[in-house]
Structure formats: C-alpha cells, structure tokens
C-alpha cells in the first residue's frame, strides 16, 4: 500500500503542468464585471457560466464602514468643516480612490482556455483561492467578486475598499487608505519599485500558486 502511494505521488509530480500566474490592478469597471453590458471580447453564450461571489452596492458599503467615524469626526466641528458625505468626499478628492480592483489569472488563452479540461482546472483553483480572500485580507473590504468564464481565459475580478481603523493621524479615525490598509496586513513597502501594493500582489500570487500546486499546476515564473 505504501509503495502504491509513493508511486502515485511521483506520477502527480511527473505530470505537473507549468503555468504562469498573473495578478494585476484592474480598471475597476463595475458595469463590465457585473455584465451590465456585453463587451466585444465576451461570448454571450457563456455569460451564464460566470460565478458571482459578491455584488454589493458601493455606497452602502461606505455607510457600513465609515458612517460612525464621520459622526465622531463631526462632533464639535464647525458646519463648514464637517463631512456631509464621505463617499462623495473621496470621489471628488485626489488622494484616494473609491475602491481598487485586482485581477488574477492562471495561464493564458493558449494553455488554459475556457471550456477545456485545463481551463476547468483553473476555475477550481481560482474558486478555492477566493474563498479565504476576505479572511486573509480583513482591511480590504470586498464588495464585488466575479469569476469570468465568458472570455478567452478564466479570471477573477476582486473589487475592494481598503481602509484603516484607529487612525491617529489627521482626519477620521476610520478612513480609506490603501497604503495603511496594506501596512496593517504586514506589507511595509520599500521604494517606488517595491511598494506595499507590489508586495501584497506578489504574496497573493504565492497563495494562489500554492493552491494551484495542490491541483497539479506548477507556477512558471518568467523574467
């Protein structure tokens, strides 16, 4: 029995397929992610294969995260210094974005095409990966999460609001901040080529690679 088990393990290693893993910042087109419209590169016959894990209203998420902090901040402030609508304040400001998006994909249209055995394997890996994303990243409040299978290659869109609590600096004690949200997760950043965001994306790719490995896919790192 032990001999058979060792043999099987060698067979799995022998047939490990090598695939690239990509993680990138997306444009954050919520209408595209939700398929409010069908772009040219989308196959309308496969739209029903898409998986929607989360699809919340961004304004409601802002109320959930920041309304109490706005109330605390406004205490004792002159009316012209008070924050009336934090969502609009961020939307109209230049320091922070309302939300950020990250996209993850295994392989490409040549080796992990939608509808193929390999493509279905990519779907399984991405599905397993996303299940613990929020738990792993508590300061990145996910409000939109979609696994698309109606384009060339299965890929995952994750839309989130990065925030920090117990902030001691200027402004509200709970506020939008990508830099501080990632710092609280342990990513300190180094220079402009080694930012908190780059460190975090690389870490998430490693998490994805570990799950892929359990499914017989080895991360092919290029460059």
Q: Predicted segments — roles?
A:
Residues 1-223:
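N-terminal nicking endonuclease/strand-transfer module with a His-rich metal-binding environment
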